[in-house]
UniProtKB/Swiss-Prot annotation:
Pfam families according to UniProt: HIGH_NTase1
Record's protein name: tRNA(Met) cytidine acetate ligase
Coiled coil: none
Biological process (GO), any one: tRNA modification
Protein species of origin: Streptococcus pyogenes serotype M3 (strain ATCC BAA-595 / MGAS315)
Keyword tRNA processing included in the entry's annotation: yes
Annotated positions binding ATP: 7-20, 96, 152, 175
EC number(s) reported in the record: 6.3.4.-
Cellular compartment(s): Cytoplasm
Catalytic activity: cytidine(34) in elongator tRNA(Met) + acetate + ATP = N(4)-acetylcytidine(34) in elongator tRNA(Met) + AMP + diphosphate
UniProt main location, coarse: cytoplasm
Keywords: ATP-binding, Cytoplasm, Ligase, Nucleotide-binding, RNA-binding, tRNA processing, tRNA-binding
Purpose of the protein: Catalyzes the formation of N(4)-acetylcytidine (ac(4)C) at the wobble position of elongator tRNA(Met), using acetate and ATP as substrates. First activates an acetate ion to form acetyladenylate (Ac-AMP) and then transfers the acetyl group to tRNA to form ac(4)C34.
Amino acid sequence: MTVTGIIAEFNPFHNGHKYLLETAEGLKIIAMSGNFMQRGEPALIDKWIRSEMALKNGADIVVELPFFVSVQSADYFAQGAIDILCQLGIQQLAFGTENVIDYQKLIKVYEKKSEQMTAYLSTLEDTLSYPQKTQKMWEIFAGVKFSGQTPNHILGLSYAKASAGKHIQLCPIKRQGAAYHSKDKNHLLASASAIRQHLNDWDFISHSVPNAGLLINNPHMSWDHYFSFLKYQILNHSDLTSIFQVNDELASRIKKAIKVSQNIDHLVDTVATKRYTKARVRRILTYILVNAKEPTLPKGIHILGFTSKGQAHLKKLKKSRPLITRIGAETWDEMTQKADSIYQLGHQDIPEQSFGRIPIIIKNERLN
């Protein structure tokens, strides 16, 4: 049986994600962000609810991306996720994209020219952000064109780079429905952005989200729930440069900006520059919120849930892979567990996120 990996956030899970799972082949393993997102946002609903939604709509296994993989720039996010999926035996990687191109060809380009491509990045002016530099790199070495807001396409390029030398088949699937950032409700396949924007429109949510009750009946989280915690961290931290990726310039800008900022958007707008993108600033503010220092990654793979078919696959891997199915007295990943504790502080109805939790099991799947 083909084993297909999918890297996802499901923030929240919606009909477009269900379409991706239905289109992908074979046994489907999801490497999913935990309670904080790649662009530096708290998850709308917690990782366990999102896992359950995925498993009820086509996923066979859901594993958690550690905090220091989940909250990273595209290249590191892709590299960490693909490394985990390779340990779980994937043969191909399926992903949605605005531009279906020959990503497999891009793997070969990077395998042959990685040194030259990396060297080229160092020649570009420091005023450019890292995403701008990487776009120029792909344009020069592979002739890849960029047309406005194409975040999934940009992630696809990172997947190609991270897949070099790994013998993975990339399977791009054309994104259907609304664009990534669209707030438009008039689509059967509405975007996650539109769903987050219109959470109070239950009729829209019920048509846009499979198993919509799981979304409607659980706490909806955003930076608004954590801004006071962040402000306290910034104002009372003796040395922000001890936080991951915070340099002297950013520390100074953040310390000044927090004194006049009433919410996260104002703070991000004040701190961001051409060099420091808004996404990067949000990630750094997330690092400050959870007091993240130098990154370390766990050896084990945390299993959030599986179907009967997924369980059969995991049994084959159990003796050769460090699979974590319950976090107890022995920790899995200290940083992720700390981030979970802070996430839980945002709302009294969020249950324990780490200690003692066991995988979600969906038993109504037939074994093939």
